[in-house]
Each structure stands twice: as C-alpha cells, then as structure tokens.
Amino acid sequence: MTDLVVEDGSIVGANVEDLESTYRIDAKKTIIATGGFTRNADLVAKYAPDYTSAFPFTGAGGTGDGHVMAEKLGAPIIGSGMMGLSGINPSLGYYGPIGGAVWSAQMTVNAEGERFMDKKFYGDTLALLVEQTNSCGYGIYDASNEIVDRLEAGVEAGVVAKYDNLDDLASGQGIDADALKKQAESADIKSAPFYCIQRKPLFIGSIPGIKVDEHCRVVNGAGEEIGNLYAAGEVMYANVFDGTYPASGSGVGTSCYTGAISARDALAALA
C-alpha cells in the first residue's frame, strides 16, 4: 500500500503496488493493520528517540507505513516507549540454545558493576538497558550454572566470554572490578570458570501509535473521526498501554481484540 484514497474527508480505498503495477482498491471501510515501526530507524528516532541504541528482533514488515499514512491524514501519533527485552545480537536474539542463555544469568550488572534488573518484571528490561553505559547489561554465570554446556557452545560461537577469575572478567568486559566482586559474593557466584554474555537491548514491538476512539476508529487532532478508517493491532498499541511492555501476551491480546472491535464496528456500519 502506498497511500490511502481520500474523498470529501473520508477514506474510500487505497493505492497499492506489486512487482508489476500500481492500482487502486476501493473500500467502504479500511482497517490499518500494518504493525509497528521497529524496522524503520528514522521512525524510531522520531517517535522513540531514547531507544535508538536497540536493534530489532521482529519481522521485516515493521516499517511503520501505517503510522506515516495516518499522520499525513492528520491523525496524531500518541504514546512513548518501545516493547523489548534483551538479546545477544540481531541473529540470535533471546531464542535457541545460545540466545536463550540470556534468561539464565545468575545476575546482570552494568559497567559500574551494579545490579539493575528485576527478574520478577521483565517488561522494563528494554527501558532499563538503554539507560545504562553503552546501552548494555552483562549477564554473569559461573561453573555451577545448569546451562554450562550451552555457555560453552556460545564460547565456541564467539558470543559468550569465558574467564578464569572475576578480575579478568571485569577487565575484559570493562566492568568495575570491586563492585562486580561484591555483587558476585552476594549472589553466591564463586565457582570458576566464569562466563559473561553482553545483554543488548532489542525490540519486539513498538508502542507509539495512531490515536483511535473506543471503536478503534481513527481520529484527527480534534478528536473527530476520520471517515471509514480504523486501526488495529500494533499500529495503535499506545491507546491500550504506554511507556513499557506490560507483560507477555499484551501485544498479541491487544491485536486480537482490537481487530475484532474494528471489524465488528465496520460490519455494523455497513449493515
């Protein structure tokens, strides 16, 4: 889709293109369900400037097309923050035998050697990481960890660092050694060898979105309905939650029920 077709202030369809041609689709009702903008660095800088150090771990289609089109029509983009967690890199993220090792850190510290993450509420992980020096947390493990075999595989892959002692770990990773050792003692991390994974901030979704009413109808800056236009799913998340990722399932759940709300309202209007 390249843009929406407007007649007399209402949406009557969309202009689209494929590999061979450009054409118009007429529609009595249009629902924007284009997802987020995690794959569009310019929109991240525009709508969530505090999060430019994070990388996307999302589908390739999250380029924010719906946000751009709606804003051109006068619809406000509301909300702040991004949805995200921590991962190793854009390929491994936090999945699989190696990527998933980020979840098993015995503690995570910043470059100052301070623990800053709450294991009980991981929804704040992204927001906390981007605030740290180098936008990075350091997951610390020792030989007693139950996933040592996976850590060793990570060492072989070049994404997990292994050290004989905590002083070498601190030096190798640029962490304050005294603070690190103090935190390690409190966490009972004492069995050599020691391992470290750099936990980087990653996106799993975006929050800022198109402003809608309770029927998921898109509205303009004055709160007036833009005729025949709806928004559902990630493209309008900020109407439901804002700032940080509330909990697992928040995005999928919101997408399901806003899709149903918008579709039911559109069908009722056409009946």
Give names to the regions the model predicted:
Residues 1-11:
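A conserved short coil-to-beta-strand element within the FAD-binding core of flavoproteins
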Residues 3, 179-243:
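A glycine-rich dinucleotide-binding beta-alpha-beta segment and adjacent secondary-structure elements
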Residues 18, 24-89, 252, 261:
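Glycine-rich loop(s) and the adjacent beta-strand/alpha-helix scaffold that form part
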Residues 27, 33-34, 111, 232-235:
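Short, well-ordered coil/turn residues at beta-beta hairpins
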Residues 63, 67-175:
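An anion/pyrophosphate-binding glycine-rich loop and adjacent beta-alpha core
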Residues 66-76, 173-176, 181-184, 253-271:
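Internal hydrophobic alpha-helix adjacent to the cofactor/substrate pocket in enzyme cavities
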Residues 101-103, 204-206, 248:
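Short, small/polar residue-rich loop motifs at catalytic or cofactor-binding pockets
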